């Protein structure tokens, strides 16, 4: 077995940037407050990059697993239950490969499979789906599931001119719940992240020209937490900051 080597860099007070190496390569990195993980945790595995968030030392919010061929995205609530929309995208084309809808960790629909850009095997969804005009520019398609006293509503908004999806989200009892994705009128990705109880929580990615520009995490009060990174177009880190409860943690080192 390969030995892991962990290096801790003090940022300020009880805040440390912790990096773990395996065979000389970066394997894991996270910001720590005392012994607790905070914000985005990066796991650099052999064939994938895994991103997840810890708040109060509990894994919560959007989880992203970026593999060679596909990107898997889900949302965990405070009980670590999978909630809202879980998606898998083809890495090369960016097309949606698979969608599963969860309400309180219960799978409500598994037949959201896409092949070559077309929906396949979706009789349940087709029978539930409704269409509604929003204004002259946009319309939405939506469907709902009920479980006990809770209602899951999955909603997709489209541009009438381009017919591209511009918003993809879910609600639990009329409050934003789980994964959300926002695109421009031409279908270019702008934002990805998660909500719980109508609030941003966990990892959010901001995009520019199809590439990640900013990675940041929000705590339960929608304040920045953990490692904040802004990137150049080639993927190199342009700026790195550290946050806790919305306040920047400034290193004493120059």
PLM regions and their residue ranges:
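Glycine/tyrosine- and acidic-biased, solvent-exposed loop/turn segments at the edges of beta-strands
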Residues: 1-254
């Amino acid at each position: 077995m390969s030995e892991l080597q962990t290096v801790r860099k003090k940022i300020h007070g009880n805040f440390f940037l912790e990096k773990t190496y395996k065979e000389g390569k970066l394997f894991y990195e996270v910001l720590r407050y005392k012994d607790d993980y905070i914000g985005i945790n990066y796991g650099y595995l052999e064939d994938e990059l895994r991103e997840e968030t810890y708040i109060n030392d509990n894994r919560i919010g959007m989880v992203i697993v970026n593999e060679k061929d596909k990107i898997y995205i889900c949302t965990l609530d405070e009980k670590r239950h999978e909630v809202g929309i879980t998606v898998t995208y083809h890495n090369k084309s960016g097309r949606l490969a698979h969608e599963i809808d969860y309400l309180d960790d219960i799978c409500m629909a598994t037949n959201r499979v896409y092949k070559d850009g077309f929906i396949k095997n979706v009789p349940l969804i087709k029978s539930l789906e409704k269409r509604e005009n929003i204004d002259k520019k946009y319309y939405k398609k939506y469907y709902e599931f009920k479980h006990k006293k809770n209602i899951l509503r999955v909603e997709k908004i489209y541009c009438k001119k381009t017919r591209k999806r511009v918003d993809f989200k879910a609600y639990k009892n009329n409050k934003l719940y789980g994964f959300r994705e926002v695109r421009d009128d031409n279908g270019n990705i702008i934002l990805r992240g998660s909500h719980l109880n109508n609030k941003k929580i966990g990892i959010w990615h901001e995009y520019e020209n199809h590439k990640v520009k900013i990675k940041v995490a929000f705590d339960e009060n929608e304040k920045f937490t953990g490692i904040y990174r802004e990137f150049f177009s080639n993927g190199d880190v342009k700026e790195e900051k550290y946050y806790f409860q919305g306040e920047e943690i400034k290193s004493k080192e120059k």
